[in-house]
């Protein structure tokens, strides 16, 4: 992975701040490439583990079809409240179906607590689960809580 980059107009995260930020159960936005060249962007739950983003979905989804054709993806995770902070990850996605139903339990529990396992089982009973593992090639961060040209709200 390249060194973390920052936008020129605003401070970014340190490595420690990045890990702390990504430990929060924020909503990620995954962008993949459609066959016509347009971008397909969807909200998705994630977990940051061992320097990679793990995203949970089903094999029948458009995002999975897109990744099968072109594994280059972008993921945006931000605070969604002022003063804003966030991370944009550009990387390569790998689809992992090995024990995906179990792996997604920890992701679901980050967002819905003790019911995560039940929800994961219900989805797996209907559709084959898959973990999208994103290996970052470039990370850009922004942290307006450190000051910027944007006034605090």
Tell what function each PLM region has.
Residues 4-10, 60-78, 114-118:
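Short, solvent-exposed cationic patches
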């Amino acid at each position: 992975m390249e060194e973390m980059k920052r936008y020129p107009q605003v401070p970014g995260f340190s490595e420690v701040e990045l890990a702390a930020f990504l430990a929060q159960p924020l909503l990620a936005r995954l962008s993949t490439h459609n066959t016509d060249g347009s971008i397909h962007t969807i909200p998705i739950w994630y977990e940051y583990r061992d320097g990679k983003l793990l995203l949970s979905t089903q094999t029948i989804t458009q995002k999975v079809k897109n990744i099968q054709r072109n594994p280059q993806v972008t993921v945006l995770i931000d605070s969604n409240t002022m003063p804003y902070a966030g991370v944009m990850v550009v990387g390569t996605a790998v689809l992992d179906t090995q024990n995906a139903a179990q792996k997604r339990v920890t992701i679901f529990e980050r967002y819905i607590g003790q019911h995560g396992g039940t929800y994961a089982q219900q989805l797996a009973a209907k559709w084959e689960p898959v973990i999208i593992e994103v290996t970052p090639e470039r990370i850009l961060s922004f942290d307006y809580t450190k000051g910027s040209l944007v006034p605090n709200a």
